[in-house]
């Protein structure tokens, strides 16, 4: 399918997310990890303004009363990617799909697949292991050619996953992505388990950055989906204790933010628990610039976003989403020193907002249905079997409910 037809076929959306009823998810408990290291951050009182949550899409009857739409394919959603004029693309870890939604919850996957009930398939590895997609990025820079029915085309949306693969979709790919790189179990004991993905440029060249939790590293790929040999840094911080490995990653304001989680005994997943997390800032060549946050309120952190003007009084603060306890913590940058912890994001009823199985945090891009002051999120609640895609705005009325 031609991508231009996808854009022009989309209905014009003028409604804003902020007018929809609020939903605040009840806080979940801590994970199975130990108490972790004591924080080197000084915790300030939680921010005073309140925020409201709207569940836009879910696969579960647990949020039918508040979600605008129900989509059975939205199972443990992780990464969110967005491009101007296009829907949000979401990586559905359990269903091995990508599904598309507007900023007000309209299901738009049918613009690609022809049916709202059919997602874009993310293929298994050569060994037949499911992709279980996690991170996802939009590529607007060219390169990253993949085969389609009309020859080689630039991949527009790129995915990585726990199956150790990098998959990609181009404008004429139809209802399935293709595998562009495979480092799954067929590669042996050191196969990759990718948990996050970012895209950025160094000296005019574009690269992908994939966090490999299994092997404690960040894999870098050039526009041919090959690993360059001349990258300066190795995304290493000697001040992070052994056992903590790259987990989430985000390109923000010209830097790469990498979250570190405690690796579990199977070397496949993160351990959760209070204080189990670190966040570093690297340049796009992999050189450490500074450690941003350390232990304290961190609990398997994954999602990262920078608050824009209009998001309460938090402009310029970093919002860090904990997978472990579902909270969104506010950090005020402090130069190259550790950031100041300002407290959790609060609902209008004075309670911390928390989403069991919290993954992505992404602000809108300014499209009519994606306000820049709305914080969109994904979460895989019910022990990562179900999913919700929603948005958070400054609260106008104190009407949160739980699920």
What are the residue ranges of the model-derived segments?
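Sequence/structural signature of beta-propeller domains
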Residues: 33-403
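Bacterial N-terminal signal peptides that target proteins for export
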Residues: 2-18
């Amino acid at each position: 399918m031609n991508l231009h037809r996808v854009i022009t076929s989309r209905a014009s959306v003028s409604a804003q997310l902020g007018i929809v009823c609020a939903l605040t998810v009840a806080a979940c408990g801590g994970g199975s990890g130990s108490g972790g290291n004591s924080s080197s951050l000084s915790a300030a009182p939680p921010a005073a303004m309140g925020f409201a949550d709207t569940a836009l899409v879910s696969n579960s009857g647990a949020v039918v009363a508040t979600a605008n739409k129900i989509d059975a394919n939205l199972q443990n959603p992780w990464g969110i990617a967005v491009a101007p004029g296009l829907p949000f693309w979401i990586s559905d870890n359990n269903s091995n799909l990508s599904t598309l939604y507007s900023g007000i919850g309209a299901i738009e996957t049918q613009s690609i697949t022809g049916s709202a009930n059919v997602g874009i398939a993310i293929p298994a590895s050569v060994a037949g292991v499911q992709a279980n997609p996690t991170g996802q990025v939009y590529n607007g820079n060219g390169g990253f050619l993949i085969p389609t029915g009309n020859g080689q085309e630039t991949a527009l949306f790129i995915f990585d996953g726990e199956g150790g693969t990098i998959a990609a979709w181009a404008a004429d790919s139809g209802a399935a992505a293709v595998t562009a790189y495979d480092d799954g179990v067929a590669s042996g004991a050191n196969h990759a388990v990718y948990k996050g993905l970012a895209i950025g440029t160094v000296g005019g060249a574009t690269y992908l950055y994939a966090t490999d939790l299994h092997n404690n590293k960040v894999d870098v790929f050039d526009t041919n989906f090959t690993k360059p040999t001349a990258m300066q840094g190795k995304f290493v911080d000697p001040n992070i204790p052994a056992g903590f490995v790259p987990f989430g990653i985000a390109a923000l304001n010209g830097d790469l933010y990498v979250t570190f989680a405690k690796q579990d005994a199977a070397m496949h997943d993160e351990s959760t628990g209070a204080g189990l997390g670190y966040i570093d800032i690297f340049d796009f060549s992999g050189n450490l610039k500074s450690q941003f946050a350390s232990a304290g309120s961190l609990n398997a952190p994954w999602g990262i976003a920078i608050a824009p003007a209009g998001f309460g009084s938090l402009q310029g603060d970093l919002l860090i989403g904990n997978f472990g306890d579902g909270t969104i913590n506010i950090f005020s940058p402090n130069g190259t020193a550790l950031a100041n912890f300002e407290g959790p994001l609060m609902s209008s009823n004075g309670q911390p907002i928390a989403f069991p199985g919290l993954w992505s945090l992404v602000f809108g891009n300014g499209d009519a249905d994606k306000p820049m002051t709305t914080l969109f999120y994904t979460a895989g609640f019910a022990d990562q079997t179900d999913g919700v895609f929603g948005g958070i705005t400054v609260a106008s009325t104190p009407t949160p409910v739980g699920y």
